[in-house]
């Protein structure tokens, strides 16, 4: 089992202590996991960060990989710290006042702009606004295809984020986007619960793994502190 998107109390909104995370992943038999705390820029300003030096020391103490979920809305500049083993790119900003098709298009254009300008390993929760707002992503297949082709050509992974299952009944991205990624040649994915509390670790992952069995995916994971691809049962 795998969970490559977890938040601890290093995140501004995280409620899970490191010891509790370790205890829960061991209890659930999760073999591959990474703590990916928020480091985010909006409107040219650093709005969410954490004490990276302390975080690195803590990860070294527990012999865990160093991860972060980085985010930028494409405004101004964004400078992210070096030294992470794993970087999730998760775009969170969207304009809920736009009509559903325009909301999705604006979000996807922002995502593509940022992807082309920052270093990352995995794109997190594509179609994220669908979790909270009315967003018509099917009306924007052209942009979704551009994003997925970029991932394939640049050997980046697509995350299937299970948190959406508990907000609107579907993972992020929805399965039709995952199928589109596969049809375009994408073969590397990863799965994350996006847990901010220890009791949410691993939530929905077995359900998503069952759905993904129809594809011949490899899963981006960590072995110690090294990024690897694995086959999951």
Curated annotation (Swiss-Prot):
Keywords: Amino-acid biosynthesis, Histidine biosynthesis, Hydrolase. GO terms for molecular function: histidinol-phosphatase activity. It holds the Pfam family PHP. It catalyses: L-histidinol phosphate + H2O = L-histidinol + phosphate. It is an enzyme of class 3 (hydrolase). GO terms for biological process: L-histidine biosynthetic process. Its EC number is 3.1.3.15. Pathway: Amino-acid biosynthesis; L-histidine biosynthesis; L-histidine from 5-phospho-alpha-D-ribose 1-diphosphate: step 8/9. Belongs to the PHP hydrolase family. HisK subfamily. This is Probable histidinol-phosphatase. The gene is hisK.
């Amino acid at each position: 089992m795998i969970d490559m998107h977890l938040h601890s109390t290093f995140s501004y909104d995280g409620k899970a202590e490191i010891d509790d995370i370790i205890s829960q992943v061991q209890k659930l038999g999760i073999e591959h996991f990474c703590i990916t705390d928020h480091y985010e820029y909006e409107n040219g300003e650093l709005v969410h960060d954490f004490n990276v030096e302390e975080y690195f020391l803590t990860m070294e103490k527990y012999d865990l990989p160093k991860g972060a979920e980085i985010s930028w809305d494409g405004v101004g500049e964004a400078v992210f710290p070096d030294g992470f083993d794993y970087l999730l790119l998760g775009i969170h900003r969207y304009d809920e006042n736009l009509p559903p098709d325009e909301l999705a298009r604006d979000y996807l254009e922002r995502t593509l702009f940022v992807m082309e300008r920052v270093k990352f390993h995995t794109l997190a929760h594509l179609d994220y606004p669908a979790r909270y707002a009315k967003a018509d992503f099917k009306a924007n297949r052209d942009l979704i295809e551009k994003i997925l082709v970029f991932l394939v050509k640049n050997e980046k992974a697509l995350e299937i984020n299970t948190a959406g299952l508990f907000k609107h009944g579907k993972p992020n991205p929805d399965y039709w986007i995952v199928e589109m990624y596969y049809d375009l040649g994408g073969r590397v994915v990863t799965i994350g619960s996006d847990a901010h509390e220890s009791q949410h670790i691993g939530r929905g992952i077995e359900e998503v793994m069952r759905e993904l069995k129809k594809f011949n995916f490899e899963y981006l994971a960590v072995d110690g502190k090294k990024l690897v691809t694995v086959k999951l049962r």
